[in-house]
Amino acid sequence: VLESVKNAVSYGVRTEDDIEADSLDELFESLVPLDDLLHEIRRCIISEEEISDDASSTLKHIRRAMKQTNQKIHTQLTALVSSASNQDKLQDAIVTMRNGRYCIPVKQEYRSSFQGMIHDQSASGNTLFIEPMSVVTLNNELKELEGKEQSEIEHILSMLSEQASYVVDDLAHDQKTLVLLDFIFAKAKYAKDLDASKPIFREDGIINIKQ
């Protein structure tokens, strides 16, 4: 609604030199641009799936910590799977995710070679996905940070909702007006596509039908 109102207001602005006033001017002029709210939403929300790091200093700090923790985990696990002494013990020299935890794929017969927590196994049972003890603490820190991130996102969305609640009447009015304008323009386009014209009605009530 906010974006549509901004676009509609820009479209509806006209000067005497542009075009003569018409019956839609009153509708366009009744729209209430809520630029402050729109700016705040744009600043905080990148898409329906993503909140901007700049939405709050707290969120930026949390995500920076998450990135650093991720890098530490990957550094340790990459060193582990790249070690020549482990090549025969691993099903693949990769780092994978199981149940939200970073793991390595260990061959069943080498289970005792790696201290850690088993989070999953392959359908055949030949591969165990183990979270090495060396990264358990880091994985725990990452899960905690993910929880804090979600809480902060919910807080940001709550604040935006509160700001929107202060102008809910204006939002409702703008939405109703936009629907009416959309209906009017749809009728106009349909009439243009049909090359239609407005009928002229006689005041005496007589209808002259011509074949």
Which role does the model predict for each range below?
Residues 1-2, 9-12:
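N-terminal alpha-helical targeting/anchoring segments
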Residues 5-6, 15-25, 37-211:
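Alpha-helical coupling/stalk and coiled-coil linker elements that connect catalytic or binding modules
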